[in-house]
Amino acid sequence: MVSTVVGDCSGRVYVRGNVLQHNHADDTLSIFKAKSGTESFVVKRVSRPFYDLSIRLVAEFTGSRRLRMHVDCNQDEGVLVYPYFDSTLLALIQNDPDLVHTQRKKILRYTAEAIQELYSKNWIHIDIKPDNILVNLDGGDTKEIANAVLGDFNIAYHLEDGKALRTRHAISNAMWRSPEGQTAVGVTKASDIYSFRLVCIYAIGGGELLLLEDYQDLVRFGITPEQEVLSRHFTYFGPVPDALYRRVDDEVGCALLRDMSKIADATVESQPERRFLYWSKELGPVAQDAISQMTTLDPTTRPTIEQVLAHPWWQED
């Protein structure tokens, strides 16, 4: 990709600058910050299937305030141009662990509204995680959140006739997947709801319970990320209901779930305090209720996004 890109839609010239995300296999697929006049943008060369998907999405969600869609493109080069954001939820909390609770909830509220917008046209995101939530600050010293949007639709999927998504292998980041998502079977809107609530747990201070920092140790002991995440989640949010097995309805997937359920049950027998019911008490009853609803292991009983947004937790300071 050359150092400048001309947008097909606007005719603007974007001058490529710093690398935001380096692709070691192919430098032309790296993500760059770019300038056009005094404005900052993100320039990203993408695969043809994702380019075509993005064109479809931007047509469906024109003018969205909560979804980060591209604002310009270059078809010949396969380049998309996005608005530039100051940070992500992941980086914001890592860099400022003392970010006030009300600002964290503001980001989460905006994210829930983004999910609602996707669902209104029967799309699921599949990869909801803190680094796909982009944030702008107001520029002052108070670290007020000016805006937050949901981005990165690489694996977004349009549900046809309410059918669950089934893939050849699990997709998205293992740390933020729903239990059914770990098996690559039975992924629906309810799967996104589960992932969103994991993001909420992270945002309100529970990151150490969710993040995998020891990938090399897992590999050394022959443990896959899926196994580790499932055993943790079943420990926190179990016991595993029969409804999850019915949703997955796949021999290999159900075997994985049962094996991890046995490990989780043994853990809880000796350490009952690892259940969400115990360690979430400090959140207060309203927050505890909101999170427990969305992280239920039964996909059929997770709340809709409208129910999520109507929960009293959002009105708490």
Predicted regions and their residues:
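ATP-binding glycine-rich loop module of kinase domains
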Residues: S3-G63, R68-M69
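Conserved structural core of kinase catalytic domains
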Residues: T62-K106
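Conserved alphaE helix
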Residues: S87-I145, Q288
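Activation segment/activation loop of eukaryotic-type protein kinase catalytic domains
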Residues: D131-M175
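Activation segment
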Residues: A184-K189
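Conserved catalytic-loop aspartate of Hanks-type protein kinases
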Residues: D192
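C-terminal lobe substrate-recognition/regulatory segment of protein kinase catalytic domains
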Residues: F234-S292
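Terminal C-lobe "cap" of eukaryotic-type protein kinase domains
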Residues: T296-T301, Q307-D317
